[in-house]
Design a protein with these regions (language model features):
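Multi-pass alpha-helical transporter architecture, strongest
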Residues: 57-59, 131, 136-167
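Intracellular juxtamembrane helix-capping segments at the cytosolic ends
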Residues: 79-94
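Short amphipathic helix-loop junctions that connect adjacent transmembrane helices
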Residues: 1-7
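Helix-to-loop junctions at the C-terminal end of transmembrane segments
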Residues: 25-36, 126
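Cytoplasmic membrane-interface "Motif A"-like loop-to-helix N-cap segments
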Residues: 33-47
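A late C-terminal transmembrane helix in Major Facilitator Superfamily
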Residues: 24, 95-128
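C-terminal ends and interior cores of transmembrane alpha-helices
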Residues: 48-62
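A membrane-interface helix-boundary motif in multi-pass transporters
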Residues: 38-41, 121-141
Length: 167
């Protein structure tokens, strides 16, 4: 990682993963209590912040403290939307299709996110085009996540309003 020794990289990566725990919990709390069940708004805010920290990390020249802050922030912020997308799909899908909605979001998230794009495609891009292009792709993925989530805002507002009127 940017020429740092393996010991420093190990600690930073551990901090990145550990930051995901409070990040995911806080994302759920923000979604439920601050935005009253509005998963899309929470996801969009988190994705903007992920993009910001990815950009800062990309542009920072060999600064262990800043790189660590960025990676911990990314770890804190990225897993919340990963969790919320499944919850969001359950909120938007008809009750009798809830299992299918959860299964499809899990499958496509794993297949295209972890198994295919994150591991194979980004490795290929780094090897053949360099790190700059990998960061451009990551920022593009953040933008796409924001845009696709934005398509659900109106339907989500309707469902939240309808749910509030029933109670």
């Amino acid at each position: 990682m940017k020429g740092y020794d393996s010991g420093a990289v190990g600690w930073i990566y551990s901090a990145y993963e550990i930051a995901a725990i409070p990040g995911t919990i806080i994302c759920g709390i923000v979604s439920d209590y601050v935005f009253k069940g509005r998963r899309a708004i929470t996801t969009m805010i988190y994705m903007v912040l992920v993009a910001l920290f990815v950009f800062i990390y990309w542009q920072t020249e060999h600064n262990l403290v800043m790189d660590s802050i960025c990676l911990i922030a990314i770890g804190f912020l990225i897993y919340g939307p990963v969790m919320l997308i499944g919850v969001h799909a359950l909120d938007l899908a008809p009750k009798k299709a809830a299992g299918t909605a959860a299964g499809l979001t899990g499958f496509f998230g794993y297949f295209f996110g972890t198994a295919l794009l994150a591991n194979i495609m980004l490795g290929y891009v780094v090897d053949h085009l360099g790190w700059d292009w990998s960061f451009i792709i990551l920022l593009g993925a953040c933008a796409l996540a924001f845009i696709f989530t934005a398509f659900t805002v109106r339907e989500e507002q309707y469902l939240v309003k309808e749910s509030t009127n029933k109670h």
